[in-house]
Amino acid sequence: MDKSCGVVLFNSGKVLLLRHSSISSRGGGHWDFPKGHIDDGETEIQTALRELVEETGIEQVKVVDGFRDTIIYTFPRGQEQIGKEVVFFIATTKESKVTLSHEHIDYSWLDFDSAFSRLTYDNARQVLRNAIEFYVSA
């Protein structure tokens, strides 16, 4: 099973979403959180933070302790169905400037309702719902 890790990033009541380019992703153009594959020797949180920097240029973040949410899904690769596990963490930042990687074509800092509408996949909306519930009660 493929494994990736990502970050639900909050800044002053808004959440960051990235729009994938059609080049880097089979489902090109979809809106999601910063995330990516684990490199050998990395922890889940190290992966999530590295991917955040690579995909957004945002380095100054504070991880919110105690939140870890996982989604599992399958996607087609050739004739195969590939299983994928994605682990998400919450972080906060005061930075709002985003420098996109080649994997993305757009970004938005959105209020929670707008983020729910913009996210492409239901499982990402559930992660956001869980993250908001945890964050506002922390």
Regions of interest found by a model, annotated:
Residues 1-33:
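N-terminal strand-loop-strand
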Residues 9, 19, 88-92, 111:
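Short, well-ordered beta-strand micro-motif
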Residues 32, 83, 109:
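Short aromatic/basic micro-patch
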Residues 33-67:
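The catalytic Nudix box helix
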Residues 57-96:
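Active-site segment of metal-dependent pyrophosphate-handling enzymes
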Residues 97-128:
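NUDIX/MutT-family hydrolases
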Residues 130-137:
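C-terminal alpha-helix
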